[in-house]
Amino acid sequence: MRVLFAVMTVATLLLPQQRGYSPIQDGDAHGDPPFLLEEGWEPLLNGTDLTGWKACDPAAKNEWYTARAVRFERHLGPTQLQGRQGAGGTMLNGPAGRTANLCTEKAFGDVELYLEFMLAKGSNSGVYLQGLYEVQIFDSWGSTEPMTTSDGGAVYHQWIGERGVGGSAPLVNAARRPGEWQSYQIWFRAPRFDASGKKIESARFERVLFNGQLVQRDVNLDGATRAALSIPEAAQHPLMLQGDHGPVAFRNIYARPLRPLIVR
């Protein structure tokens, strides 16, 4: 009986791939993180140090550090995160939560990205695909106001003529309370260029899941969002994590090549 149960369990785990399930979920699949369940994921943190990462601005003060663990104590300091500094798979943006923005040394084009993050109360960060297009990280937990392009899960707006333009508010408020680990899964399609270098298709967020809930679908990006790197749009650029807007911790950052979108 135990052998039969084991065989049935393995078969059940294999069924989704055998049935050709869509590589892009719309928030209807839950369980362990995708990098544990699916093939092709590349870790962007090595579990020891910050190899593979650098300050986006070489002249900026870089206080990012790795930690074995991170702690949030609401009654002692709700606006702070405390990391146990040393070799580990979590990274924090300095003791004060305000330091340089961090970039990968590797450049990415079309990519599927998964990452986990923790915020202190009222904190703010962002993940910039290609250093240009931001999915906002913000403490929106408990908000009952209509969602805006400044809330967690938003595609942040551009800044044109001293005002915010465009962007995309999240479809739902999926934020968890400060001090809890949260996750993004992002499907990003890079801009397209012709042989002369002229852009012929805008970049696009095909899907964004925030804590497993669908918050963005097919959002075209006419240009870089606010506070992006001062670089031109291109087929490939590094990933950027914002480090100068308040305490944030990151772990389990994985990437793999974007697969075709199959709507089921």
Predicted features by range, described:
Residues 1-4:
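Positively charged n-region of N-terminal signal peptides that target proteins for export
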Residues 8-17:
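Hydrophobic h-region of N-terminal signal peptides that target proteins for export
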Residues 17-264:
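Carbohydrate-interacting regions of secretory-pathway proteins
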